[in-house]
Structure formats: structure tokens, C-alpha cells
């Protein structure tokens, strides 16, 4: 995206990609449908970015969902809005959009150098890094590339097999740049299930639940795995529970198995238990819990479940699931951490290296799934590219 903004302004752009092809993580993101952005109000979207919201807001307002959808349509890939407000290309896939995008960039004169890994900056005669000369390691060995500006978009450290391996972190730290530790975000959580529970329910979805950690609550469907839980509502709370696990050794999620019913409504339904009716049948018949939901209730409580309707209703609304860890960084959808916002200007230029800009997951921000990750990546790329143009004009 940054290359397109720069090339449109007449800048000669060379994209150096250390993988054999461009856009692999975009293709991965579109494997089950490319969720590009979201249609919720901008203020609500910005709030999703938590502590980084103030820094990202100007970029998202300048290039937000409307601009992103228009850009996609100009590439022959109109978008549609799903029932949840999420935005997808009409093809639902990333490949057609990526092909059209790369073809357009090439017609604009953008060149691509593949299998070329950025290794930092060349040193000036005085021994300090020279921000106008980048070093690369490629198929033809080490090279030095001089440029008026450099824009780094090296990603975080999730899914390293598609390119974002976090290898830049130590390079920037050695250059004196404050980089906050990269940690898994939007990831599965680990739970110490009993073998009998795993054998029967691994791979089974727990539908229409709400998961809460602290002040973070998200509805949706979760999937039981051999090691814990995954899925949209789990991803939404994963950063919050990760922080607790890192601090205390274990964390806890509260799962509402019937988010559409109040405690009082559950109590009224549970009041009608038939003679000799088993607890499982009672829960299934009166409040519609699925077999996996009932098993999760038993698993989380060690089968210490009250037969008293009021206590049972309260438990159904707040099933305590102990979390012993989260998925590793290389299995997370995204990563949190990155270059501290204090180390970049409003246009995401490195303060220590004037003329070098950064965008996307390299920056220290975090967001849930739902289109926010791609939107922020596109928005910061446009903002950084426009900042680079302003820099060029003044230098």
C-alpha cells in the first residue's frame, strides 16, 4: 500500500521481499475469507486499539474503511458487508485482489526484488548506522542499497513461515530503538483438559457463548482443541488472559453458556425438573445446553455442580475455565508489542533515523480480529507513505 502511494506521487519505488513471492501473509489471512475491515463507526473502531488508539486515530480517519473499500473496488474487487459488519472482497478470497494489486503496481513502475532479506543499515565512516543505505542478504549475496527514504513493513512475528519472523527486532534494538517484546495475540488458550474430555470433544464447537476476561467480553463460537480452546471469542480475550498468566502463572476465563438468557430466566426454566431426571438431561431439556457445553461445565468444575436452580443458573452464566497458557507466538494470528510509539513521529518516521518510516505490525499496537488488523496495517502504510512524501519535499 505504501508503494502505491509513493509511486502515484511519481517516486521510484523498489520493494524488497525476503520471501520467494509477495503477499504470503495476506493470502494466509484470506484462507477462510479475507476480512479486510469493519463497518462500525470510526470512533468505535479506533477504541479497539486500546492504548495505541490516540496514535492510530489520525491514520485510520485519513484512510479508513470507506477508502479501503474504494481502493479494492478500483482493483476490480468490490466488497460486501457480512452479517456481523465485517467487510470482505466479493470473491471472498485474497488471491484475486493480490494479483490485481501486484499487476497495478508493476504498471506504475514499482520493482520487486525477491528473496532479499533486510539486515539493517550500512555504517557511516564514523561507525554509526547510515539511514540512507540499507543492507540486504539475497540470492546473490550481501548488497547495499542507497535510497532517499526507506519504509519498513516487516510485520510482527506471527506465522513466520509466511515471512513475518520478527528478525528485525534485535537489529533495531542494537540501533538504539525502543522495541517492546513481541508477544502472541489473537491466539488459542491452553487448558489442562482431562483425557476423557479431549477424546470425546476435541474438534467440537461450543456455539453461541460469551467469553469474559476482566473488562473484555466477546460473543461467538469457540472450538475445543486437544490443548484448550480457540475461536473468535477466545482470540478476543487472549491478550488479557495472557497478561494474567504471565503475571500469576495461571489465568481464568469466564464463559457464559447462555448469553441470551438472564440468570432469572434460567432459574425459571430450571425450576421444572422431572422426577429421576439426570442432571445432563435436565440441562439439555430446560435451558438447551448442548452435550459439549454440558461437558465443559462439568470439566471446568470437576463435576461439582449444584442441583439448586439459582446456584446452577449462576454457574451457567459464569463457568470458570482455568487457563494455563496461550499458544506460542508462531501460532498466533497476530503479535502485540513492537516499536514504541514514543520512538516515531506522527507520520511513523523513526526519530533516531530521519527518513526511515515504519508501518503495520512493526509498531506497538494490538487489536482483535474482525478486520481491524488489516485496516490498521493499510492505514499506517498510507500515513507513513504520505509522511515520506512530505519528508522528500522538505529535503
Located regions from the model:
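Short hydrophobic core segments
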Residues: 16, 118-119, 143-164, 172-173, ...
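Residue-level recognition of phosphate/Mg2+-coordinating polar/acidic sites
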Residues: 8-9, 21, 42-44, 61, ...
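A conserved short coil-to-beta-strand element within the FAD-binding core of flavoproteins
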Residues: 114-131
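Glycine-rich FAD pyrophosphate-binding loop
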Residues: 7-31
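A conserved beta-strand/loop capping segment in the N-terminal third of enzymes
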Residues: 27-98
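N-terminal Rossmann-like FAD-binding beta1-loop-alpha1 element of flavoenzymes
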Residues: 1-15, 378, 384-389
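A conserved beta-strand/loop element that lines the FAD pocket in flavoprotein oxidoreductases
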Residues: 105-118, 182
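Short beta-strand to alpha-helix junction loop
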Residues: 56-66, 84-103, 113, 159-164, ...
